[in-house]
Amino acid sequence: MPTLWKLPRHKQSMMSARIHPCMRRRVLHAGDPCATMLTSMSTSLHHRAVEHLGTRIVGGALPTGHVMLAEHLEDELKVSRSVVREAVRVLQSLGLVETIKRVGIRVLPAHRWNPFDPLVIRWRLAGEGRGAQLRSLAELRSAVEPVAAELAAGNAPESLRQELVGISLAMKEAGDAGDMARFLDLDIRFHALVLSGSGNEMFANLIGQVTETLTGRTVHGLMPEHPQKQALQWHMDVAHAIDAGDGSLARDAAAKIMRQTIAELAPSWDDQPRVFVPVSKN
């Protein structure tokens, strides 16, 4: 599109009338409503571009080795070059693509992706490889959460212990009532507190991954209409054991939760192969 200053005066006026007043402002200050609006617009376009490309790459629509050009993405997504650049930078940080000078933006193989990033997890859960992703996450949680519960029993601050007990009781109420939206929020908070209460920052940094796992189960219809009563009891057992400082009981109850989770989800991955990541010879 030609720039305004090259157009005849009457056409300049017509096009100018279509531009939001904020777009004509040259100076914006912090707190200015226009600054907020424009930032929101930019963030929304950027988010849409990242989601569109990330979903297609992880879902296989854009296979390994596929090359994209920035100008084509501008046309496809109806966004500016700066939005494309920002989106590509995000995808690069996730290991999904690389930029090659005078070639373009190339899709990288799955073993180069960051499997711990919540975005990658969400996109995998939305695709055909959902079962394999659920298996990997369930096995990770099985290895970590019982240990985290045991550590929390010995290290968590009193306020966290009390909140955990309260949440476990609220989870039972929500589960019995079939209020799965509230149950999901409480379940996410429960497991986040267990990981955080361990006092291990590596465990605490898995909260995002666990959140995507629990959310994905609900979004993709992999949760029962009412949580198993035994599972609700095990959550309360974990909370009370942590509150009482009983690490062994906390670990055992958390392990029971994960064994039940695996039993419920196993049919979703029975026919999906495992992923073997190449090991570099350094």
Language-model features: where?
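Short linear motifs at protein or domain termini
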Residues: 5-6, 11-14, 18-143, 150, ...
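Short basic (Lys/Arg) and small-residue
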Residues: 194
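C-terminal all-alpha effector/ligand-binding and dimerization domain
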Residues: 165-168, 172, 189, 205-282
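A generic "binding-loop/recognition-motif" signal
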Residues: 103, 190, 199
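Short loop-to-helix capping motifs
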Residues: 70, 178, 199-201, 245-246
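All-alpha effector-binding/dimerization core of bacterial HTH-type transcriptional repressors
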Residues: 112-189, 230-256
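Short, flexible helix-adjacent loops and helix caps
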Residues: 58, 62, 149, 153-157, ...
